């Protein structure tokens, strides 16, 4: 197990590709401990150290799963004696029609909109509330 007590720690959602993936690489290069969260299991082609041991698979559209992830993040932080210096809620969804067109509020099912709001609005609030103590302790 790696000793992270003397490094800053960031939790980053939506880390498996795009902006999230680039953000992980940047913070890792700067010496931060990066706890990644995404719907996918850790991809072995991701080039940062401690990747698999600091990855949490979580479905942000599922409130219960978010709660489980918060508990796991807190456990990992506590186990290593470190605080949380930053939380980046990068994950987000913007579902489209098959042709790439935007969804219409009247025609799109409420189930889809609930998932969009859960991932884009409620999950970040749940993560911030759940990790507030750790963020405050580290002045994050």
Predicted regions mapped to residue ranges:
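Substrate-binding pocket helix/loop in short-chain dehydrogenase/reductase
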Residues: 98-105, 109-114
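Rossmann-fold cofactor-recognition segment
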Residues: 50-64
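Conserved glycine-rich cofactor-binding loop
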Residues: 16-17
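Conserved hydrophobic beta-strands of the Rossmann-like cofactor-binding core
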Residues: 9-12, 87-88, 92
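A short, exposed helix-loop element centered on a Lys and neighboring polar residues
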Residues: 128-129
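Conserved glycine-rich Rossmann-like NAD(P)H-binding loop of the short-chain dehydrogenase/reductase
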Residues: 30-46
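Active-site loop of short-chain dehydrogenase/reductase
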Residues: 8, 80-85, 135-140
């Amino acid at each position: 197990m790696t000793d992270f007590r003397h490094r800053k720690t960031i939790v980053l959602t939506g880390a498996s590709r795009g902006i999230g993936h680039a953000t992980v690489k940047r913070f890792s290069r700067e010496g931060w401990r990066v706890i990644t969260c995404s719907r996918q299991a850790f991809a072995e082609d991701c080039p940062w150290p401690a990747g698999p041991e600091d990855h949490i698979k979580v479905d942000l559209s599922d409130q219960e799963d978010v709660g489980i992830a918060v508990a796991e993040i807190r456990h990992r932080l506590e186990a290593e004696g470190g605080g949380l210096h930053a939380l980046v809620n990068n994950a987000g969804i913007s579902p489209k029609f098959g042709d790439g067109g935007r969804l219409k509020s009247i025609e799109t099912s409420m189930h889809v909109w609930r998932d969009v709001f859960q991932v884009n609005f409620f999950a970040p609030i749940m993560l911030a509330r759940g990790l507030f103590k750790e963020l405050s302790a580290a002045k994050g």
